[in-house]
Amino acid sequence: MKFIQNNREATALLAIVCLFVFPGALDSQYLSVQTLTMVFSSAQILMLLAIGATMVMLTRNIDVSVGSTTGMCAVLLGVMLNAGYSLPVACLATLILGIVAGFFNGVLVAWLKIPAIVATLGTLGLYRGIMLLWTGGKWIEGLPAGLKQLSAPVFLGISAIGWFTLVLALLMAWLLAKTAFGRNFYATGDNLQGARQLGVRTEMVRIMAFSLNGGMAALAGIVFASQIGFIPNQTGTGLEMKAIAACVLGGISLLGGSGTVIGAILGAYFLTQIDSVLVLLRIPAWWNDFIAGLVLLGVLVFDGRLRCALQRNLRRQKYARFISPPTPLQAEAKTHAQQNKNKEVA
């Protein structure tokens, strides 16, 4: 159990391998590199959101507005492209909007001291409303071919956006694991008061986490538009829950201070892989959310039981040195007393 708790990435990877091999027993065509790349392509949006959610959850916060942020950013991208702006300018404006939206969430939480769940529930409606005001409730269509080209395979069946997602994930994993910048996120989530005493600017760390989360939501909006080719008026709905679920599946603690980006990426891949397996098994699409939720609940229950067991073990080890082992005479006396008790009962 200790190995599982300390190696959540390996556990998530093992789950992915099992979910890849078992359906292959039903259909040998499923066991192919094409299947892996297809699932990865579908998982890119969720992976980007999981990276952002990781930053927020490490600081012991949560952002439920990220789906609305994704939709709002995708709408801005579509509106600007249809207005004649170039693709780089539209993408840059979209990224800035996402960062600003995340920054606003961070200000509400870190400076105004509003609980994260309450603040982001408010901005969830706000950003969704802005999105609908821009579109008038209509879909955005007629996006330029240059945007769709971003999702076209370029090497090993992976698109330019796919390679960008992989590089970004590795970069964020390195920043969190190897730099003081990343360690501040862990310190803030693990022990807020202790981090402050060590000189960590915890308010700025939390604002940075929400801002990065908003930037990742903007990138997810760009990927969504490039893959789909149009922007529905419900873009991003429900993605916030999937992003949080991916992080939890990958070992990110809801209590903050533990987990890795790699684990979150694997969790996002696993959730997307479930959808592909359901398609293979010809299970109706409306079962997807039910089964994904069932898997998440199972992981949460297992994770909770695992943490309780580890905490009991740690307490036992902590106080073991204060409990002296019984002497041979004490052990023999205890044995005789137990035998006499058994005779009396008999």
Curated annotation (Swiss-Prot):
The keyword Transport applies. InterPro entries: ABC_transp_permease (IPR001851). GO terms for molecular function: transmembrane transporter activity. It comes from the Bacteria. It holds the Pfam family BPD_transp_2. The chain crosses the membrane at residues 13-33, 38-58, 71-91, 92-112, 114-134, 154-174, 212-232, 248-268, 283-303. GO terms for cellular component: plasma membrane. It is a multi-pass membrane protein. The complex is composed of two ATP-binding proteins (LsrA), two transmembrane proteins (LsrC and LsrD) and a solute-binding protein (LsrB). Belongs to the binding-protein-dependent transport system permease family. AraH/RbsC subfamily. This is Autoinducer 2 import system permease protein LsrC. It comes from Salmonella paratyphi B (strain ATCC BAA-1250 / SPB7). The gene is lsrC.
